Amino acid sequence: MAPDTRPHALPHAVSRLRAARLARSSKPFLARGGPHGERCAGCRLVPSHCLCSLRPMVPTQAGVCLIMADIEPLKPSNTGWLIADVVADTAAFGWTRTSADPTLLAMLADPQWQPYLVFPGEFVAPERVVTTLIACNRATQPTAGPPQGGLAPSGGRDPRSGGAWGQSAKRPLFVLLDATWPEARKMFRKSPYLNHLPVLSLESEHISRYRLRRSRRDDHFCTSEVAALCLDLAGETLASQTLEAYLDVFTHHYLRAKNQLLVDGGDAAHMRLQALRLPGGATISPSL
């Protein structure tokens, strides 16, 4: 057998959480729908439709913290994975009803971050709801390094990112409940360690473009769409647009694999992602 020379993405927070969850499983996880057979460890797609060479990473000041329902990291259609591909400062934790990961609690208390729990405001007490980001200065806060296993301060970033967060300002940390809607509501109600966080309620006139799972409402967004809206609110325009384009490319590869069709590397989704790529980033090949 010829060696596998395809470029594989390095493991990120969601990938590591998936590996840990698989290690605890007593039997293999069988995904419903989607392509069957061998999957690439870097993108969860079948090897013929691998996405790893197209993975874009955009330096940001904002961070994302995913709190994931039990089997969510195992689902090939999960889009939290895409967020971790694009935003280096993405952390991921499994949710349990009875306890919270100490590293998660340390991250939420870290003075470099201003955390926001992203959730629809209609289900939250009005005094907790915000619709814009809070201007916070960390100069008056106690100083501390990043917690063990947490997110380190971001280095340089592409000037097109547009994040308006200076060295003295707290960096926004968007806490997303990555789950089905019924699960997310349960997680919101039964996570008292999140009760002190401001709740960021997003307002968007857009309709979800996510096509890999069904939803009864067009205004229910998948996790990566929510993250893109958050990044846009933080002024991280390049990261927001890149994540949107990357979701479209992932959807194209996923559905083409499901229907046993070749990838069209020259379609509008791939060309948009190509146009947004950072200097020196991966070049999209129409010959995939």
Positions of predicted regions on the chain:
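Short cysteine/histidine-rich zinc-coordinating motifs and their immediately flanking basic loops
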Residues: 51-66
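Short hydrophobic beta-strand segments
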Residues: 63-70, 114-119
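S-adenosyl-L-methionine/SAH cofactor-binding core of RNA-modifying enzymes
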Residues: 88-185, 189
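C-terminal folded domains that constitute the principal catalytic or ligand-binding module
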Residues: 173-174, 181-288
